[in-house]
Amino acid sequence: MFVGDGEMMMGLGSLATAAVDRTENLTVVVIDNEHYAETGMQPAHAGRGVNITEVAKATGFPQALTVRTAAELEEAVDRILNGQGPVLATIKVTTDPAPTALPPRDGPFLRSRFRTALLGAEAHV
């Protein structure tokens, strides 16, 4: 299964469940750009020191690895595809700003915009 780092951080409990159940046919590939791309490129926890691979290891994943280069990916493909699961591979990627991406927004801005949409301008009185 493929997930982004932000999505994985929101569902860390699933790692513990897969590890405890020893889900042998499960491979989780985390595409880690260290940002919440879907909501405006806010920095994600993975970019602030949380290591998803180490979290997977701590929950009991027998195989968890981080890939940073194309050469490392080439070396890891067999392990990712055929390893005794559950397997987690964090693939670090860089993020180039896309012209269609939302502008960066912080939490307070998003909260205020949401309140205004629900309650109108009087939401800020």
Predicted regions and their residues:
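Short, well-ordered secondary-structure micro-motifs
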Residues: 12-14, 38-42, 76-77, 99-102
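Short secondary-structure boundary segments
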Residues: 30, 68, 91-93
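Short, solvent-exposed amphipathic alpha-helical segments in soluble enzyme
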Residues: 16-20, 44-45, 81-82, 105-109
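Conserved thiamine diphosphate
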Residues: 43-79
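Conserved beta-strand scaffold positions in the cores of enzyme catalytic domains, especially
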Residues: 28, 64-66, 88
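Active-site pocket-lining segment
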Residues: 32-41, 57
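Thiamine diphosphate
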Residues: 1-34
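Glycine/aspartate-rich loop-and-adjacent alpha/beta segment that forms the canonical ThDP
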Residues: 83-125
